[in-house]
């Protein structure tokens, strides 16, 4: 996705979130701020973690009012600690109050994913293994969640169903065999398209190698079977480990020598990073 298309997609998603939250009127804000009043509000970290999504946070306020501005003390990928001043938002008080929740939802979610990814990726230091995400993302949030994974030190697997062939158990059942599934994928997809296949045992791995798969994913295979599979593949395909990956076993999996470890938990299980907008201050002296 090129940068222009990406911006349009992101703007549409943020506007959709704002429409969902505001609908017709922010009745609370309209009650206490019936007219425009210049103000500032402070962005504060309430927990330790990695910041991600600052541009999305700022864009939320800009879409409500182009005159809004945000000054950050940190950049995406920086570590923050509880109590740190992260930035200041300046603009119409009505915009600051009405946009607060949506802006924080994006920033907290993305920062939580970046923090979780950072902690998992740290366990892979010194290995060749790359930590990658999956398509197990929140509907409507994929572009943000995958960006957060990269900010946290991970890499993106395929973005969607159009970007690569991934043959899973049901695809293999539909085709009739591992070999047939790979052959059919090669016949249909462009020669530039990567073909990956999910294997559950050594027999499937052997068949996938012989059929010419580009990447072979070990799905919930035992440690010993994965070691045997890597030896069997002998560099003829890239290898990926998936299933039940956590901070306690990720290093042992990497030490097998797999090229990639994929984890859906990066996006579906990461807790948010607690951040807050505090100390709104009116600047008109009224």
Predicted regions and their residues:
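Short, charged, intrinsically disordered terminal tails
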Residues: 265-286
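Short, structured secondary-structure boundary patches
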Residues: 219, 237-241, 281-286
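Basic/polar N-terminal segments that are highly enriched at the extreme N-terminus
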Residues: 1-4, 284-286
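Acidic/glycine-rich phosphate/pyrophosphate-binding loops and surrounding catalytic core
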Residues: 2-211, 215, 227-232, 238-241, ...
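Short secondary-structure boundary segments
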Residues: 220, 243, 264-265
């Amino acid at each position: 996705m090129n940068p222009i298309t990406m911006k349009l997609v992101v703007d549409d998603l943020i506007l959709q979130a704002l429409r969902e939250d505001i609908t017709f009127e922010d009745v609370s804000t309209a009650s206490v701020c019936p007219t425009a009043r210049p103000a500032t509000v402070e962005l504060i970290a309430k927990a330790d973690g990695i910041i991600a999504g600052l541009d999305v946070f700022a864009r939320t306020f800009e879409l409500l009012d182009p005159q809004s501005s945000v000054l950050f003390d940190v950049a995406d990928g920086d570590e923050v600690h509880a109590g740190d001043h992260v930035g200041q938002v300046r603009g119409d008080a009505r915009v600051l109050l009405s946009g607060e929740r949506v802006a924080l939802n994006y920033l907290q979610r993305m920062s939580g994913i970046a923090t979780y990814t950072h902690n998992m990726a740290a366990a892979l230091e010194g290995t060749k293994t790359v930590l990658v995400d999956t398509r197990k993302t929140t509907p409507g949030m994929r572009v943000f969640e995958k960006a957060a994974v990269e900010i946290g030190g991970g890499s993106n697997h395929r973005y969607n169903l159009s970007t690569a062939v991934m043959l899973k158990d049901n695809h293999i059942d539909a085709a009739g065999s591992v070999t047939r599934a790979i052959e059919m994928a090669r016949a249909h997809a462009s020669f530039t398209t990567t073909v990956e296949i999910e294997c559950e045992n050594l027999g499937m791995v052997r068949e996938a190698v012989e059929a010419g798969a580009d990447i072979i994913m070990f799905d919930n295979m035992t440690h010993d079977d994965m070691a045997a599979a890597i030896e069997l593949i002998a560099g003829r395909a890239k290898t990926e480990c998936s299933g039940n990956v956590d901070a306690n076993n990720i290093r042992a999996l990497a030490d097998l020598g797999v090229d990639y470890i994929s984890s859906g938990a990066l996006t579906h299980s990461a807790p948010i990073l607690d951040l807050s907008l505090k100390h709104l201050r009116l600047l008109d002296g009224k």
